[in-house]
Amino acid sequence: TSTDAKQFMVYFDGQEKDRFETFFGALNLTYTPNKTSSYALLASGYLTNELVAYDISGEYWLDQAGTSGGGDGGSVIGGELGVGRYHEHARNRLKASVFSLGLRGANGISNHNINYGIQYNREKIHERSREWELHDSAGYSLPVDPTDLKVIYNQYSNHDISTNRLSAYVQDTYRISSSIGYFNINGGIRFSYWDFNKEFLVSPRFNIGFIPERDPRWAVRFATGLYYQSPFFKEYRMPVYDADGNITIELNNKIKSQRSYQFIAGTDFTFRAFNRPFKISAEAYYKILGNLIPYEVDNLKVVYTGINSSKGYATGLDLKLFGQFVPGSDSWLTFSLMKTQEDLNGVKVPRPTDRRYSIALYFTDYFPKFPKLKFSLRGIFSDGLPTTAPRSTRDKGYFRTPAYKRLDIGFSYALLPERAEGQPKRSGFFGHFKSIWLGLDVFNLLDISNVSSYYWVTDVNNIQYAVPNYLTRRQINVRLSIDF
């Protein structure tokens, strides 16, 4: 703050080498014996190979900064708070493959449309992970121990695991027209089993939509259901501490799927203005959350506790206005309010995704009298997210990052406009192209420094200070878009 200013200087050394390889493949076979029935056989595969390797060191100075007290507004150094060095090391390897085989069917019977399916998943995961972090202050490794050399953080993980999942579902969509309007009713149930934790789940859900006969511009809807999110590998990695504070990762086979009871109500209203179509959409929701797996965001890494130790809720309101000024491209304005909270170790704290408000705008239109020139404007203003110190939790203390603010503008010029309906086809070289656009974009027009994460520094009194890392500021981008 202006009354408690700090001066921070750091020199970095080292490097990081990461590799992320992802492969997808899918095969779908569909059989349609008649207009009301269809069947599909689906097979897919997913493979990821990840390597995160770094050795990064830094030497830092943290000083108390003051003001000179005069009218010159100069600054002076008010005392040394910390001098030290740190070293972060990681060799993390993860290989994962997921194979899926499923059968789906759909049958139409009168006003009913029945969908059903069954799917089998086979998951194989290979992980080797070693991380440690060394802090050195005035030649002493922290924490100081007269008998042993210790580091401030050390983690080891070595796992090979194969699991199987089986799921099935059935749902019925019923459509009916009456004297008061049109109804669309959908109800279904999903079953799932996972052999890793021997968990069998039943998930019912229901939704209804209504369009009144008297004014079909309106549409209202309501949905409710019990939903489960089955954990994947990183969510059931559970840290276990020994007497010296070293961490070994174990896989928690007692983990349960996170649960959510959801209630959602919404409405849409379509109308025309300025000789263009518009739609207003409003939606309110409330979700009761249980069996939550708490997590924290450390820089750009998500760290899970690996246990179901929390419960909470999420509620909010979304308002959206859509308009089409350019054919085939929607402009929109959104306003959202949200509150999500959980009970963490007996303390009520906001969840890491608790963004309490957000306003976003996207507008695109042609310039008057210049149909080849198109303008776009995109802006966002949203609340900051809760954050805390590394290897800490929000129940021990947290703060919010500053609000996110950004404005982008763009200009596009049609070097080759799209052919209008009724116009003859182009000949020659340009006959192979549908349209060609040359664009100029200015990202972060106002050159705002938005915080992405924090670098944490510890002083001689073991007090931690958050030094912000900023996202990219203003950028200019030139693009060429060709449609065939």
Role assignments for model-derived ranges:
Residues 18-197, 281-284, 332:
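Face-selective signature of the C-terminal outer-membrane beta-barrel domain
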Residues 38-44, 50-52, 56, 254-308, ...:
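Membrane-embedded beta-barrel scaffold of Gram-negative outer-membrane proteins
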Residues 175-181, 285-288, 305-389:
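Gram-negative outer-membrane beta-barrel transporters
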Residues 2-4, 213-263, 277, 284-305, ...:
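Surface-exposed extracellular loop regions of Gram-negative outer-membrane beta-barrel proteins
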Residues 41-47, 116-122, 187-191, 208, ...:
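Transmembrane beta-barrel strands of outer-membrane/channel proteins
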Residues 19-23, 95-99, 162-166, 200-202, ...:
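Residues that define the transmembrane beta-barrel architecture of outer-membrane proteins
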Residues 32-38, 108-113, 176-183, 213-218, ...:
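Short loop/turn motifs that connect adjacent beta-strands in outer-membrane beta-barrel proteins
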Residues 372, 380-390, 413-484:
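C-terminal beta-signal and adjacent terminal beta-strands/loops
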